[in-house]
Amino acid sequence: MPLKFYVATRFSNKAEVRRARRLLQRTLQHEITYDWADKPLQVVTESHLKASAIKELEGVQDADYLVAILPGGFGTHVEIGAALVTDKPVFLVVPHA
């Protein structure tokens, strides 16, 4: 059974999310739990934000490990915390460091 991962970062890093997803899927045959980066941009309402947050945290819960691409937004830090609380490995990616 392949391992599952979730990628956390800020919305403006969508290209990096896609790159990480392709790399992990093609080279390791791992599966992404929730691919928020390919979701269409929607009008942001409170109900949309709540539904997105729930899906993203479920993605973290369902993952075997989390990849965090820095810098991230506030949600990235929440997702890292959720992974750590459940003893999931967290891999930090710092492009251009």
What are these regions (language model features)?
Residues 1-97:
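Conserved catalytic or regulatory cores that recognize and/or transform ribose-phosphate-containing ligands
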